[in-house]
């Protein structure tokens, strides 16, 4: 590896760390905002999105830990941990959304939830794109996989936003728990990809 290559790699690593620290900070703030909004609106979608933020914090911590070490076993462990985080999220959302739909539970409107999920969707899509580019440049599968976690976070934010807007505007209460099923689909797909690759 030349000096120029080493400098380029160091710059990419710094970018990777910066993206993960930004994600951590955003999701820590998100847990506080979503906790208040979910309780006030009694919304399963906002509660589930808060759990997703907690899992995203864990996934970012895994990547920071992995980037601080060497490749090989640390990458394999990192990918497995992210896979387990996906599994926890999928099980929670599947169970919670099903219970709420079966019970016919009606959440309240949440202006705070609408604003936060709209801004979060834009932020997560931007961070996910940055992680994907940086992960490819570093040939780092953990950063690339966590980038997909962040992308799913953005998709969930958009789905929750749609559910909140439909509930507030049209009274479609079922759109709130139905939003949880969107993430379950993507989470299961990522779990299969991570573990079928033999990590």
Residue ranges of predicted features:
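Alpha-helical transmembrane cores and adjacent cytosolic helix/loop segments
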Residues: 1-199
């Amino acid at each position: 590896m030349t000096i120029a290559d080493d400098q380029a790699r160091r710059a990419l690593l710094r970018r990777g760390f910066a993206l993960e620290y930004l994600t951590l900070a955003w999701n820590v703030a998100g847990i506080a905002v979503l906790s208040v909004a979910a309780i006030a609106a009694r919304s399963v979608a906002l509660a589930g999105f808060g759990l997703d933020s907690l899992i995203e914090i864990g996934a970012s911590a895994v990547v920071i830990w992995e980037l601080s070490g060497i490749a090989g076993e640390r990458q394999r462990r990192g990918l497995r941990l992210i896979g387990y985080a996906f599994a926890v999220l999928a099980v929670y959302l599947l169970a919670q959304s099903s219970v709420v739909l079966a019970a016919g539970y009606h959440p309240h409107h949440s202006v705070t939830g609408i604003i936060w999920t709209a801004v979060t969707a834009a932020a997560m899509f931007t961070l996910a794109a940055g992680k994907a580019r940086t992960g490819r440049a570093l040939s780092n599968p953990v950063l690339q996989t966590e980038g997909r976690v962040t992308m799913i976070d953005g998709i969930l934010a958009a789905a929750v936003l749609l559910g909140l807007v439909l509930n507030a505007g049209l009274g479609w209460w079922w759109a709130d728990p139905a939003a949880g099923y969107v993430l379950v689909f993507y989470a299961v797909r990522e779990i299969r990809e991570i573990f079928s690759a033999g990590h």
